[in-house]
Amino acid sequence: APDFSTLELIPDKLKEFGNTLEEKARMA
């Protein structure tokens, strides 16, 4: 069976990744 707790965490990781990219883009 798939691990739904991991699937639920994926959107948060994507949001964190997007925020990090935005911050780096602003600093550049």
UniProtKB/Swiss-Prot annotation:
Subcellular location: Secreted
Key words, A-Z: Lipid transport, Secreted, Transport, VLDL
One of the Pfam families matching this protein, by short name: ApoC-I
Highest taxon above the source species: Eukaryota
GO cellular component: very-low-density lipoprotein particle
Keyword Transport: yes
One of the protein's GO biological processes: lipid transport
Function: Inhibitor of lipoprotein binding to the low density lipoprotein (LDL) receptor, LDL receptor-related protein, and very low density lipoprotein (VLDL) receptor. Associates with high density lipoproteins (HDL) and the triacylglycerol-rich lipoproteins in the plasma and makes up about 10% of the protein of the VLDL and 2% of that of HDL. Appears to interfere directly with fatty acid uptake and is also the major plasma inhibitor of cholesteryl ester transfer protein (CETP). Binds free fatty acids and reduces their intracellular esterification.
Family of this protein: Belongs to the apolipoprotein C1 family.
Protein name listed in UniProt: Apolipoprotein C-I
Origin species: Oryctolagus cuniculus
Gene (name only): APOC1
